[in-house]
Amino acid sequence: MNSKSAQKIIDSIKQILTIYNIDFDPSFGSSLSSDSDADYEYLITKTQEKIQELDKRAQEILTQTGMSKEQMEVFANNPDNFSPEEWLALEKVRSSCDEYRKETENLINEITLDLHPTKESKRPKQKLSSTKKNKKKNWIPL
């Protein structure tokens, strides 16, 4: 996964983690530089573990603050609730993730098209024969 957008995400996350004095696991970067299946498996496992940990911590924060998830989203989308440094770091992560998501969607679409060509490309279109509408038999116009 030698993607520029993936590296941007890593750099953005490192920046946010540095603001809050949280250590970044360097094994993520080394897994991204290799294309072996074992490294991808390791990366997926570690990512899932981190997501579960973050979900648990997010739930704890929601419980402590008494906010709903929707209220927390509104809070998180308001730049007045963060220092300029924190807000810039968050915006950088958001834009990096959006770029990565778009790149991944495009890649998935390309792979899907390669594996499953559209039905139109398999079968040539048939010409529709134009048929004149016949008058009904025994029709008496008024």
Curated annotation (Swiss-Prot):
Could you name the domain of life of the organism this protein comes from?
Bacteria
Positions with biased composition (Basic residues) = 124-142
Q: Positions of the region Disordered?
A: 115-142
Similarity section: Belongs to the chlamydial CPn_0742/CT_635/TC_0003 family.
Question: Protein name, please?
Answer: Protein CPn_0742/CP_0003/CPj0742/CpB0770
